[in-house]
């Protein structure tokens, strides 16, 4: 248990940070799920739109420290490859 005032404050801040990060991670997953659903339905225009809206969310996750840069790039690359194959 945190004993010093500084440690107590850090514990409070960590709890708040964890809540914010949890919400951001959930938001990113929601956008990715929308792309997956559009791909599964076979609608190439909806999939492309969903991918366009998911990209800034992924990159925002990188800048906020939720995702590693390479992880976000890998996810974008794999999704865009699938969307491109859908329209071809």
Swiss-Prot record:
GO terms for biological process: translation. GO terms for molecular function: small ribosomal subunit rRNA binding; structural constituent of ribosome. Pfam families: Ribosomal_S20p. Keywords: Ribonucleoprotein, Ribosomal protein, RNA-binding, rRNA-binding. Gene3D superfamilies: Ribosomal protein S20. Residues 12-22 have a biased composition (Basic and acidic residues). One of its GO terms (cellular component) is small ribosomal subunit. Residues 1-25 are annotated as: Disordered. Binds directly to 16S ribosomal RNA. Belongs to the bacterial ribosomal protein bS20 family. This is Small ribosomal subunit protein bS20. It comes from Dinoroseobacter shibae (strain DSM 16493 / NCIMB 14021 / DFL 12). The gene is rpsT.
């Amino acid at each position: 248990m945190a004993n010093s005032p500084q440690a107590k404050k850090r514990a409070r801040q960590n709890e708040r940070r964890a809540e914010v990060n949890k919400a951001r991670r959930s938001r990113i997953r929601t956008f990715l799920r929308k792309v997956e659903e559009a791909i599964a339905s076979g609608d190439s225009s909806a999939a492309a739109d969903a991918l366009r809206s998911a990209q800034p969310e992924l990159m925002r996750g990188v800048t906020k420290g939720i995702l590693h840069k390479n992880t976000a790039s890998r996810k974008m690359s794999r999704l865009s490859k699938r969307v491109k194959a859908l329209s071809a």
